[in-house]
Amino acid sequence: MKICIISNLYPPSERGGAELVAQRVADELSSRGHDVFIITTMPFAGIKSLCPKVTEHYVERVYRFFPLNLYHLFNAHRFPHFLRLIWHVIDLFGPFPKSVIKRVLKDEEPDVVFTHNLKGLGMSSAFQIQKMGIRHIHTIHDVQLSVPSGILVCDQHKNREQISLVRRLYEKATKYAIGSPDVVISPSNFLAEFYQSRNFFPNSEIRVIPNPTPKYVSREERGTVSPSGPIKYLFVGQIEDHKGIGVLLKAVNNLSFPFELHIAGDGTSVQSVVKKAKLDSRIIFHGFISLEHIRKLMRNCDCVVLPSMCYENSPTVIYESFQVGTAVIASKIGGIPELVIDGENGLLVEPGNISELSEALSKFEKEREVFWNKSKEIQKSAERFSLKKYVDELEKIVASIK
């Protein structure tokens, strides 16, 4: 079967978990004998970058092109809001990306197209796929079809954001652009219900399938003896205010026992973290690191902390943490409570509540040995999120579409 995967970003140009999911699925499908190719974006690099070309040819072929807009998605934070507004309009209605994708699809003639995040690649590309009559499966990863930034902090969707005229107009445009794929996959019940409540995908079948863990599973044990020394907390992800990094740094200031806070990632708030790490030896900043390095940190740290302030879908870092047997302290928001069970594989706290997060960090320190003893149990629980099972489901879904 020839399969096309379309994603606004694709490794090594990744910003979040959606791109990693797309790559893992591509690799697994290829290993099963399917002919897989990718369509994704690249920053502007002269006139030639407007034409799609295969820039990598590993197991899968990767077509990259610049989707003719004011700037590339990666550079959005550098531009003022009025230019971002124009950028969003072009992304929604610009004909160029749609024509490029149409040309590639006509040349390749895939049996099915899997789409992931499309913002920055041309949102109406989805409508083009459906117009061509190709089987179409779309995976939603965040709220970007409802909120341009893809970020909805705490209770925004219950108050002023709910009645925003701009947001309503934006939703109307994205509903038209995304259309109704044959099947829409949501990694969490939260996100599926979020979009259904806002009348997206009226003619699509909605399926909830949690994200897959990486195919590689380390055989290295976390340890069978009781941990000693300062407790080690780990934050992995985008270093942004909406990810709760500021809340976490304030929360650890309230701790009265020895600890280490390891931070790995990159983002617009990285300089404040670097400054904090220079002033406090208990805070260790690793920067943007490889997945293998992340796994090593997860194995060696006592727990992963995910203090997000925004409505998360189904964070990849939780799956990866469970896969190595490490518990998670996380915000009780979005789809996180569907993965983290309070007291079993981690602890849940109210988002943005500094004192509650401090209490959870302290509680974990007291129950440190208890959670280490649960490592194998936590690791085993991650087996239901295996990449093999995930792709098995995808193949069944494709076969069911007439």
Segments predicted by a language model, with ranges:
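Conserved acidic donor-binding segment of nucleotide-sugar-dependent glycosyltransferases
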Residues: 342-343, 347-354, 363-369
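Nucleotide-activated donor-binding/catalytic signature segment of Leloir-type glycosyltransferases, i.e.
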Residues: 273-292
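Short alpha-helical donor nucleotide-sugar binding micro-motif in glycosyltransferases
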Residues: 288-289, 296-301
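Short hydrophobic beta-strand element within catalytic cores of glycosyltransferases
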Residues: 327-330
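Membrane-proximal helix-turn-helix segments that form the acceptor-binding/catalytic region
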Residues: 103, 131, 144, 160-184, ...
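N-terminal subdomain of nucleotide-sugar transferases
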Residues: 1-61, 106-108, 253
